Amino acid sequence: MQKSRNYYRKVKHVRILKKLKSNREDKQKYRIGVYKSLRNFYAYIFDPWKNKVITSVSTLDKSNGYKGNIVSASSLAPDLYKKMKKLNLENESYIFDRSGYLFHGRVKAFANALRDQGVKF
């Protein structure tokens, strides 16, 4: 049976998480993760000490037509930054977890928009 692209993406993601867990310096950093489907884009902040998601944003919250494009993904960055400010997390250092996706398209647009807001990763 032929394995799908999504299967290999999950294998990459597990490999990345193993590296993050083994590195002591990265254990003290919050993780910004992304997930993309065909129609929507999701981003979350993960707390490594409590092992849970602190806050998240997605294009499901927006009401502007088709939400699976680069413009919609990059428009989520200010929303996530507002939530980070509300939780006093804007000055923390982060790890950008691309979840096995290529750093291209929606993932890259979101990361660059978040860097423009002043987030360091």
UniProtKB/Swiss-Prot annotation:
GO MF, any single term: structural constituent of ribosome
GO cellular component: ribonucleoprotein complex; ribosome
Keyword Glycoprotein attributed: no
GO terms for biological process, alphabetical: translation
Transferase found in the keyword field: no
Matches recorded under InterPro entries: Ribosomal_uL18_bac-type (IPR004389), Ribosomal_uL18_bac/euk (IPR005484)
Keywords of the record: Ribonucleoprotein, Ribosomal protein, RNA-binding, rRNA-binding
SUPFAM superfamilies found in the cross-reference section: Translational machinery components
Chain's role: This is one of the proteins that bind and probably mediate the attachment of the 5S RNA into the large ribosomal subunit, where it forms part of the central protuberance.
Subunit description: Part of the 50S ribosomal subunit; part of the 5S rRNA/L5/L18/L25 subcomplex. Contacts the 5S and 23S rRNAs.
Assigned protein family: Belongs to the universal ribosomal protein uL18 family.
Protein name according to UniProt: Large ribosomal subunit protein uL18
Species: Mesomycoplasma hyopneumoniae (strain 7448) (Mycoplasma hyopneumoniae)
Record gene name: rplR
